Structures are given as structure tokens and as C-alpha cells.
Amino acid sequence: MGLELISVIVKDYDEAIAFFVDVLGCALEEDSASLDADNRPKRWVVVRPPGSGCGILLARARGEEQEALVGRQFAGRVGLFLRVEDFNASYRHMSAAGVEFLTDPRSEPYGRVAVFKDLYGNKWDLLGAA
């Protein structure tokens, strides 16, 4: 058993792909046409962080209820955790790309960590080795 995908609700597929691939360094694994439950066209977009067993399904918001949750999926808490091999290099790259970090890097018993927001405001932990 394993966790295959998590969903992140996005406003726009292409801007989300650009952020996850160009800024976070994820691989674009799939971007294909599909249909939703109401038989309306959509895209099936999956990105995956390097070395991760779990991918991220970029799900475009449909309707007011979903649009209101973009960037608020975790009710203001850190809800996503991105572990990287080289914390300092990733932090520098993301900072240079304009990512908003809410905390300075710090050391915790589980490693180096800094909290950042994705392009929609969801909070993430950037994690690295201690």
C-alpha cells in the first residue's frame, strides 16, 4: 500500500505547472485531456518532486465553493511538506524565484526547515537534513 497522489486545488493549470516545475523542481509526469464527473473537459495534471513516491495532482477549481478554497486547503496551517536533498541551494533558488518564505531557516530535531507559501498561499515546509 502507498500514497500515490495528493490534490492541490489551483486557479490555472499552466501557471501552477510553471510554479511546481520551474520553481519547486518537480517533474511534469502527465498533462492529458480528461472529463470530469459532469462530462465537462478538464486536464489530468500530475507533477512529482524528485525522488518522491507521491505525486501532486493539480486540480483546477470549478465553481465558487472550490475557488474560495484555492490557497486555503489547510485552513491556514502548514499542510504540505517538501523534502529536498540540498536545503540551502533549494532555499536560495526558491527565494531568487520570488517564493515568499514566512520563516527564516531553522534547525529542528527532524532537520532544517523554513515555511513558505506556494503561488496560491498554501503553506508548505521546506525540509532538509539536519
Briefly describe each language-model feature range.
Residues M1-G2, R72-R77, S107-E108:
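Short glycine-enriched loop/turn motifs at secondary-structure junctions
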Residues M1-I17, V78-L80, A130:
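N-terminal beta-strand motif that seeds the catalytic metal site of vicinal oxygen chelate
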Residues L5-V8, R43, L82, Y91-A130:
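Vicinal oxygen chelate
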Residues S7-C54:
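Core segments of cupin and vicinal oxygen chelate
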Residues D12-Y13, E85-N88:
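Helix N-cap motif at beta-to-alpha junctions
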Residues F19, N88-H93:
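Short amphipathic alpha-helices within nucleic acid-binding modules
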Residues P50-G55, R62-Q66, F87-N88:
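Short, charged/polar surface micro-motifs in flexible loops or helix N-caps
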Residues E67-G71:
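A short, polar/proline- and glycine-enriched secondary-structure boundary/capping micro-motif
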